[in-house]
Regions:
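N-terminal cap/lid segment of alpha/beta-hydrolase-fold proteins
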Residues: 1-19
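Short beta-strand/loop motif that positions the catalytic acidic residue
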Residues: 141, 147-149
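Alpha/beta-hydrolase active-site loop
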Residues: 72-94
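Catalytic histidine-centered segment of alpha/beta-hydrolase-like enzymes
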Residues: 180-191
Length: 209
């Protein structure tokens, strides 16, 4: 598993690559606030098995990445979204034609922020957005969208996930699971295999042609 360096503004990010580049399709995996890119190590190979290279990025201040991750303020520049856009740019420089984003909790909000400005093929959020997002911002998210959340999410994300989903433009899909798990904790729940399969299949489907 090689480690790549990504320039995001004046900062250097570390990212773990699963699979090979160049590739037709790749996914950027974005971690939550209490873990880092290594937390995707058991998830990323599932994408590779479906022909999708996976780049698990460490946001600023996490596991070797320089800088510090900033706080989210709606409508303001936000470093995690900028970091995700930098990862997308690196993949395109490496010959990737279709880029998907998958983010959990903080990472899900970062993926949404990036997808408001980048022409990504698809974006998947897990337990995100945790905080409310204005409808006009959710409407800007590009590509195919899949929101995945536990109905009893311990951080109370479910209502904000639903509100954001309603404001999204199609194509879009929402999956609520019975439980209270948050972020990557969903993968360890009884419904975890079903949730993982739904996410991987959604990303691997790609665009027609």
């Amino acid at each position: 598993m090689p480690t790549l360096e990504i320039q995001s503004e004046k900062f250097t990010l570390k990212a773990d690559l699963y699979g090979n580049l160049p590739a037709k399709r790749a996914v950027v995996l974005v971690h939550g606030s209490s873990w880092d890119a290594l937390g995707w190590r058991d998830i990323a190979p599932h994408f590779v098995e479906r022909g999708v290279a996976a780049l698990a990025v460490n946001l600023r201040g996490f596991d070797g990445s320089s800088g510090k991750t900033g706080r989210y303020v709606p409508g303001k520049p936000w470093s995690p979204a900028t970091d995700v856009k930098a990862a997308v740019a690196l993949l395109r420089e490496r010959g990737v034609r279709e880029v998907a984003l998958v983010g959990a909790s903080l990472g899900g909000s970062a993926a949404l922020g990036a997808a408001m400005e980048e022409d990504v093929e698809s974006v998947v959020t897990i337990s995100a957005p945790v905080k409310a997002v204005p409808d006009e911002m959710s409407a800007l998210v590009r590509g195919r969208k899949l929101y995945v959340c536990a109905i009893g999410d311990t951080l109370g994300a479910a209502p904000n996930v639903l509100a954001s989903f309603k404001a999204l433009k199609p194509p879009k899909q929402l999956l609520f699971f019975g439980g209270k798990e948050h972020s990557r904790g969903m993968f360890a729940a009884p419904y975890g295999p079903e949730a993982l399969e739904a996410i991987v299949s959604f990303v691997a489907r790609g665009s027609p042609g």
